[in-house]
């Protein structure tokens, strides 16, 4: 059954009004608030609390290596053609796992394992097997665990795909970005159409449970017509999930982006048309619009979770997993434990040095206050469910003993008057509900509850909403 999504109109004035730098809210507070004054002992305390609660676990491992730079990339990467450079890194990750694993109650179910990058398939099969076994020996996976990996389709063959499936991965994701050759040239990611269809065919033959592909809009030389052609070809691939990300052009943070022709970037008006067409075209193809940038088939777990009001969000994006603790391994990885965020060192040197001293390789972190936890829940509900129940929030955090929802968020509710007048949300007797127009600008709605975004200069740290 096709799920339609109403077309919404934006005036130029409204577009300019809301096209501001805003976090993507994969966490609250955003990762930009992590600081080096963080007390590493809070990391241990958070693990202990999770042990006491028997909180399920998700694991993330960062593989930073890439054969060449993709100019659009905002991830932490190491560009090298020297494969042996990977071995010392894998040994260091193994050391981190050996430090963390004894602290974690083995009775806690590990429901997710994800490898991201970088390019995880930069690893040889022998290296991948070593890392996989190191992780699963220390953290036995639940029988129904989601075990996923990101790949660059330029660097795989049929044997590699089948070996990943045999190793234990049951989900796979790869980036297309755009089928258009001019766009691919501009971003230094050449992926012939025939190759992408061949890789998808191998993945289906290997019987992965779920396949996700990533697209990006806002890249150089893109326009409405060319991107709709990319959408058409993507639908022919028939992935289970499609992520369509708004390109974060932040050359002041990611200098490699300066290699792209800035003059060829589509304006905000064109990007909005692209996003609206994306929603229309993919829903016409039978996909369900999930969150702010994901699409899934109606029988996919993401779509089911959204229908049930059970969709969640963490540093990896939207997930079906309930409240779980996320342990991050490798450089730059972020752990998300109870009321604590902790990020590993960003450089190999600092990462290696810490582990050589048998010290947790934590560079910075953040301990959430009660107010942070409340606001995190509000933002998560808005980003995942597109509605907010004041009664449920009051019950969860005992707000009624001191003040109710309306008192606690009096300032924010007043600020929402403007967004309501612009048609982004509507008030309910028991809270808020986001409109179809508001879903496209959901980051703007969430930002009203972000106390860390008051400093205007911080907006320069984030990509624009449109």
From Swiss-Prot:
Report the GO molecular function annotations: 4 iron, 4 sulfur cluster binding; coproporphyrinogen dehydrogenase activity; coproporphyrinogen oxidase activity; metal ion binding
Per the record, what are the reactions this protein catalyses?
coproporphyrinogen III + 2 S-adenosyl-L-methionine = protoporphyrinogen IX + 2 5'-deoxyadenosine + 2 L-methionine + 2 CO2
* Annotated [4Fe-4S] cluster binding sites: 66, 70, 73
Looking up InterPro entries in the UniProt record yields:
Coprogen_oxidase_HemN, Coproporphyrinogen-III_oxidase, Elp3/MiaA/NifB-like_rSAM, HemN_C, rSAM, rSAM_horseshoe
Q: What induces it?
A: Induced under microoxic conditions.
Q: What is its main location?
A: cytoplasm
EC code: 1.3.98.3
Query: What does this protein need as cofactor?
Result: [4Fe-4S] cluster
Presence of keyword Ubl conjugation:
no
Task: Give its localization.
Answer: Cytoplasm
The entry summarizes the disruption phenotype as follows: Cells lacking this gene grow significantly slower than that of the wild-type under microoxic conditions, while they grow normally under aerobic conditions. Coproporphyrin-III is accumulated at a low but significant level in the mutant growing under microoxic conditions.
Under the heading CDD domains, the entry gives:
Radical_SAM
Q: What SUPFAM superfamilies is this protein classified in?
A: Radical SAM enzymes
Write out the GO cellular component annotations.
cytoplasm
**Which residues participate in S-adenosyl-L-methionine 1 binding?**
60, 117, 150, 334
Which segments constitute the Radical SAM core domain? 51-285
- Any one Gene Ontology BP term: chlorophyll biosynthetic process
Q: What does this protein do?
A: Involved in the heme and chlorophyll biosynthesis. Catalyzes the anaerobic oxidative decarboxylation of propionate groups of rings A and B of coproporphyrinogen III to yield the vinyl groups in protoporphyrinogen IX.
**Family membership:** Belongs to the anaerobic coproporphyrinogen-III oxidase family.
Subunit structure, as described in the record:
Monomer.
Record's PANTHER family? COPROPORPHYRINIGEN III OXIDASE, OXYGEN-INDEPENDENT COPROPORPHYRINOGEN III OXIDASE
Protein name per Swiss-Prot or TrEMBL: Oxygen-independent coproporphyrinogen III oxidase
- The species is Synechocystis sp. (strain ATCC 27184 / PCC 6803 / Kazusa)
